[in-house]
Amino acid sequence: MLYLAEAQSLTTASTDLTDDSVKVHTEIPKVEEKANPIPLPEKNIKQTEKTTDTLPSIEYDIEKLPAPVKMMRQKIIDAAKTGDVNNLKPLLGTSGDPTQLSVSDNVKDPITYLKQLSGDGDGLEIMAIMIDLLNSGYAHLDQGDDEEIYIWPYFVALPIDKLSKPQLVELFQIMTAGDLEEMKEIGTYSFFRIGITPDGTWRFFITGD
């Protein structure tokens, strides 16, 4: 099991990679919406809940994923299992449409950034987190519109204080009970999550509320 507490203890010095110091923690600095061109899933979930009481569908069956999504998921897992974070680089989008790794969207070197997020400094911890997330259940959000996304883990789409005991067991595979209590204070799941669009684009790997 990977512990968020270890990731939270990581604070790196300011570098030329981002405008601010790179830190791994549960919360993300609040930024203006215009600074974040990729809509975050929580915003869409809250908007949906205003008009319907229906929760997003939760799935475990990988075969139900569209072929491009299933392929990208497997590519991320395979790259992470190599133990070399550089193998993720071809999957992280292009300079014109990069995978979002930070809410402020100011990451200049994604591989170095991922290494700095990782407690070991080589990206191994971060890759293990990716594998754990992609082996969990997923949610299908915003079906049929331009922001449609498949997101791991599905906890992002559910009220964090309403999880069943079996769901909590799943949650504790990627974080601790102490982390859960902190998230209850925030009111939402705030650990890492991965989003892949229906066409197989790796849209984001971010953390925060």
Please give the residue ranges for each predicted region.
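Short helix-adjacent coil turns
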Residues: I76-L88
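C-terminal-biased regions
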Residues: L4-T15, P29-R73, K89-D209
